[in-house]
Amino acid sequence: PARLKFLKSDNYEALLIKRIVQKFSLSFLDIEFNLFIDDKKTFQSSVIKEKSWDEKLLLRSTKVLGEDCLDNSIKISEKSEKFLIRGLLGIPTFNFSNSNNIFFFVNNRIVSDKSITSIIRVAYRDFLAHDRFPQLVLFVDCSSSEVDINVHPMKHEVRFRDLPSLKSLIINSI
């Protein structure tokens, strides 16, 4: 925050920082991340060499999300004319009370877009209770002409030129 008075407790701010480092860790699989808070290592992710992108993502996701991710996720990789989506989908029985375990990336950029979260909720609606959220690590790759990143000052939100096509691809894949 721009002003000291808007800072939360030290523990909460440390949690937010750790979450950002974890998101970057998922986005950049070929980079090692180490986070120290008060001289204690609170997060570490090593570089995994000579593995496929899918294997690297699974190992890194296990580091970020825990061992349960390994047994409760399904790999996804689907392509349309404009979009490539890939990542890990949590099985419906492995769900949460909030959306903290939904990680969404567009061209490796961390995105927290409510429209994408609602698309994911629609895709899971027949499998999850209304107040539950899946675990999901989803990457969308597309041409830069298909996405506008200048919607939000911090670039968290994006707008897609052909959102219906992306929505259809995500829903059909899930």
Place the predicted regions along the sequence by residue.
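N-terminal phosphate-binding caps/lids of nucleotide- and nucleic-acid-binding domains
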Residues: 1-174
